[in-house]
UniProtKB/Swiss-Prot annotation:
Organism: Salmonella dublin
Keyword Transcription: no
Gene transcribed to yield this protein: vagC
GO molecular function, one term: DNA binding
Listed PROSITE patterns: SPOVT_ABRB
Entries under Pfam families matching the protein: MazE_antitoxin
Top-rank lineage group of the source organism: Bacteria
Protein name as catalogued: Virulence-associated protein VagC
């Protein structure tokens, strides 16, 4: 197990993550305390954030040719 030092950064306490523990491509972390542990994990989008995503094309659910045949299937 590795250890890191805690230092003061203004009014906050901080640590430096070792390079091999970097969250590559992540700009925001969620921090949670569980007992005597502190867990860092990437912030996940909320369901509400889907409203801001680009909408699907109008023909997204249009009739399309079946690409999988029913051959070999049986009725339940």
């Amino acid at each position: 197990m590795r250890t890191v030092s805690i230092f003061k950064n203004g009014n906050n306490r901080a640590i430096r993550l070792p390079r091999d523990l970097d969250f590559e491509g992540v700009s925001e972390l969620e921090i949670v305390r569980e007992g005597d542990s502190i867990i860092l994990r990437p912030v996940r989008p909320t369901w509400g954030s889907f409203a801001q995503l680009e909408k699907a094309d109008p023909d997204f659910m249009a009739e399309r040719e079946d690409v999988v045949s029913d051959e070999g299937r049986f009725e339940l």
